UniProtKB/Swiss-Prot annotation:
Catalyzed chemical reaction(s): Exonucleolytic cleavage in either 5'- to 3'- or 3'- to 5'-direction to yield nucleoside 5'-phosphates
Subunit structure: Heterooligomer composed of large and small subunits.
GO CC terms, sorted: cytoplasm; exodeoxyribonuclease VII complex
Protein's job: Bidirectionally degrades single-stranded DNA into large acid-insoluble oligonucleotides, which are then degraded further into small acid-soluble oligonucleotides.
Protein name as annotated: Exodeoxyribonuclease 7 large subunit
PANTHER family the record matches: EXODEOXYRIBONUCLEASE 7 LARGE SUBUNIT
Record flagged with keyword Cytoplasm: yes
Cytoplasm is among the record's keywords: yes
This enzyme's EC code(s): 3.1.11.6
HAMAP family assigned to the protein according to its UniProt record, in alphabetical order: Exonuc_7_L (MF_00378)
Amino acid sequence: MSEYLSVTTLTKYIKYKFDQDPHLQSILLKGELSNFKKHSSGHLYFNVKDKDSVISAMMFKGNANQLTFEPKEGDEVLLEARVSVYERRGNYQIYVNKMELDGIGNLYQKLEQLKQKLKKEGFFNNEHKKPIPRFPKKIAILTASTGAAIRDIQSTINSRYPLAEKIQISTLVQGTQAKEDIIKNIKYADSLGVDTIIVGRGGGSIEDLWNFNEEDVVKAIFECQTPIISAVGHETDFTLSDFVADVRAATPTQAAVMATPDQYELMQQIKQYQFSLSRYIKQYLEKQYKQLDHLASYYKFKQPSLLYDQQIQRKDDLERQLTQLLLSKIENKKYQLKVLHQNFNVKTLNQTILQNKRQLVNVKNRLSNLTMKNIHNNKLEFKNKVELLNNLSPTNTMLRGYSIINKDDKVITSTQDLSKDDEITLAMKDGNVDAIVKKVRCEHE
């Protein structure tokens, strides 16, 4: 009798077969994400599909944390996974270990990451933007030597501002060698001393334009000292070169427009300036003519002598006043000199000298008498003080029979300072006597 298998047993057997097949344990798969969900646990659940089939898939939190982008519905992805069976539902599904964007999606991811990095470093800040010269003498054009871009730029410059010298620098704008060629030619153009540099090319896919998203190209544009207009692709195309350039043009033609003034507009401005200047000069001359006519009608201009008659008379008056003033000054000085001469004669001078001599002798005599009197008085005062000092001297006192008692080199002035058997010294006029106190008697005893 045949043995019937349970659903669980069959499911486990199928899972065992899947898990043991080496071809299913490490597969590379590409497809589109659908029904994408991120669980609160951090695990990812989604389907991978192409136009004909759908496979269930999941990615554990640990692997999901290693992703360099945020997966979303509709992303084209490349997966590294293993195939197994989810026993509870009996479905086979893939367990994804690695995931990355496929093709263009990966390029857009790299573009966004580099854009954010450069933005954070300040490469796109407005303070670094240089103004485009209004009237350029030389314009360097960096683009392919053939193609619509160079033709559009040259024809536009020729029609708008033929005075500008165009320096075409043939540059690779696509391919593996384009990046280095773009960088080299930007540095070369910067060294030429041109006024403006146009870097551009025609439109294309993101892969075609990718060289203008390279970090080294962006830095070369940023470091360039000459103003740069970026004209890469069509109006809807954007590259990192557009963000870092001083000005972004939607097309190569627009770049040429931004780099040059319009000669016809300039001619109109010049004509307007000529008209305004002519009108101003005409109005100014009319005003001056009117003023001249008004002055010419003034009565003094009809009789020119009236302009200077009064001035001549005024000059004569000033001359007379000046002459009178000088004569008056001279007479005054003569008078002062005469007075001085009268006051200053020999006789008067001799009398003055003689009188001063007499006064000097009198002062000298008075001073001498006063000095002698002061000396005499001082001598008497000194003598009296010396006599007084001698009378008060201890030596004179001892000459009269008195003595001075010393104890321990101190003068004794009272019996209260002595005791029996004290050793004392008696100072007399002709020497000292050492003695011992036998008895002390006070006056009140």
